[in-house]
């Protein structure tokens, strides 16, 4: 009698597959394990099942991809205002990942790559938009500073270092990196000094744009492995950048004047449109009329502008928007500081006039949302320093006088209220 469960007969001679029951003579290979045997046919069958499941997952990737409306809703949770930019980004990102899905199928129509250019003042939310997109889509994300980049062979970072940073974010998983998002900040700082080609070599301006061309359009970049130059004998990793979404951002100070000059030239003499002082448009409204020729005039080379077909402009944040940024988003600064104080068992309250005072201060400094944390950190520094050593504190209150530096945060103790700073106790 044969014991098929153990893969042996009573005599201990003939072996059987524990899954399909075939003997060792009916299959090419029988692999032994602890009290179990598996034949090559069952191994191949398992591989086929796994392969089919992976194909089903990749074919349904488009179904799992958030729709533009859903992408916009998530952006609304973290970014205040900038409705036009959110809509442009939602559509561009959706189409980009639909393009990657279509790329795996053979079709007559080949979808071209649509990288994104974000134009807006400092602190308007360019970086936060890109970060939120990457976090929502669960793809690798890295930020590169264009001002540190130079042409290959010169002192500074090579453009290939951008891809290496992306690989580091996903533990050198090439497949994941090839679907990541790269945000290149301060791209306006690599504009050439004049719109006429320079005789001298511009290694940190036009040279960087030239170096970025192929990377952004889609090429196979050779990136050193984890060891880098310490292990030169290792083979370089080959990364196809065709599926990587590149988002370039910059303040482009003075671009509004370039746009105005172009629009004013369009109407001279009797056909000129005369505008009163009241009809003067804001910088944000002017930037919405940006054309590729304006970017070329500003200092970007035509080929580089052509690689960034999707352009989204962001408006300068007003006082009300800054107040909302302080308190409304999921990870708003006020909520973050309230969480820190809550860990000490203390309630932190910001009054409405305090939030407006912080917003006005940020506007005076022209730092946008980026300067809000600096202001709050300065205001709460002494309180956060002394609070862990204090007892019986129930609440800390901040009003506009505290923001203006006229007084310190009010400390409310258990069963009594005292108007004194944490540092005075």
UniProtKB/Swiss-Prot annotation:
Any one of the GO CC terms: HslUV protease complex
Keyword Repressor found: no
Binding positions for ATP per the UniProt entry: 121-128
InterPro entries noted in UniProt: AAA+_ATPase, ATP-dep_Clp_protease_ClpX, ATPase_AAA_core, Clp_ATPase_C, Clp_protease_ATP-bd_su_ClpX, ClpX_bact, P-loop_NTPase, Znf_CppX_C4
Single GO molecular function: zinc ion binding
Record-annotated ClpX-type ZB domain positions: 5-58
Binding locations of Zn(2+): 17, 20, 39, 42
Gene3D superfamilies: 1.10.8.60, ClpX chaperone, C4-type zinc finger domain (6.20.220.10), P-loop containing nucleotide triphosphate hydrolases (3.40.50.300)
SUPFAM superfamilies: Glucocorticoid receptor-like (DNA-binding domain), P-loop containing nucleoside triphosphate hydrolases
Function: ATP-dependent specificity component of the Clp protease. It directs the protease to specific substrates. Can perform chaperone functions in the absence of ClpP.
Family statement drawn from the similarity comment of this UniProt entry: Belongs to the ClpX chaperone family.
Protein name: ATP-dependent Clp protease ATP-binding subunit ClpX
Lineage: Bacteria, Pseudomonadati, Pseudomonadota, Gammaproteobacteria, Chromatiales
């Amino acid at each position: 009698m044969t014991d098929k469960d153990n893969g042996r007969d009573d005599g201990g001679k003939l072996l059987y597959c524990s899954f399909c029951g075939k003997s060792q003579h009916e299959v090419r290979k029988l692999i032994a394990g602890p009290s179990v045997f598996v034949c090559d046919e069952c191994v191949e069958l398992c591989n086929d099942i796994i392969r089919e499941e992976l194909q089903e997952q990749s074919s349904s990737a488009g179904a799992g991809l958030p729709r533009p409306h859903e992408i916009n809703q998530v952006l609304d949770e973290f970014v205040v205002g900038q409705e036009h930019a959110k809509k442009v980004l939602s559509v561009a990102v959706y189409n980009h990942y639909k393009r990657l899905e279509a790329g795996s199928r053979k079709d007559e129509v080949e979808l071209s790559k649509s990288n994104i250019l974000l134009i807006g003042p400092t602190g308007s939310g360019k970086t936060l938009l890109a970060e939120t997109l990457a976090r929502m889509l669960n793809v690798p994300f890295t930020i590169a500073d264009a001002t540190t980049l130079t042409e290959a062979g010169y002192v500074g970072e090579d453009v290939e270092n951008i891809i290496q940073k992306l690989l580091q974010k996903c533990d050198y998983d090439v497949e994941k990196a090839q679907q990541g998002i790269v945000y290149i900040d301060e791209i306006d700082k690599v504009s050439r000094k004049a719109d006429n080609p320079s005789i001298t070599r511009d290694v940190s301006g036009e040279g960087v744009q030239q170096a970025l061309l192929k990377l952004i359009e889609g090429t196979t970049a050779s990136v050193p492995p984890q060891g880098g130059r310490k292990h030169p004998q290792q083979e370089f990793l080959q990364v196809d950048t065709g599926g990587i979404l590149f988002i370039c951002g910059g303040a482009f100070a003075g671009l509004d004047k370039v746009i105005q000059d172009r629009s004013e030239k369009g109407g001279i003499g009797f056909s000129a449109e005369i505008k009163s002082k009241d009809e003067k448009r804001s910088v944000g409204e002017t930037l919405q009329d940006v054309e590729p020729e304006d970017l070329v005039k500003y200092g970007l080379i035509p080929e580089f502008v052509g690689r960034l077909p999707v352009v989204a402009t962001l408006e300068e944040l007003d006082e009300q928007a800054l107040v909302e940024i302080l308190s409304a988003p999921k990870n708003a600064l006020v909520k973050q500081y309230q969480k820190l104080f809550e860990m000490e068992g203390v309630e932190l309250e910001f009054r409405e006039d305090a939030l407006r005072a912080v917003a006005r201060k940020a506007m005076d400094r022209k730092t946008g949302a980026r300067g809000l944390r600096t202001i709050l950190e300065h205001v709460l520094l002494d309180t956060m320093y002394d609070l862990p050593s204090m007892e019986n504190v129930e609440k800390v209150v901040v009003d506009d006088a505290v923001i203006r530096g006229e007084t310190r945060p009010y400390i409310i103790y258990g069963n009594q209220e005292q108007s004194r700073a944490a540092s005075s106790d």
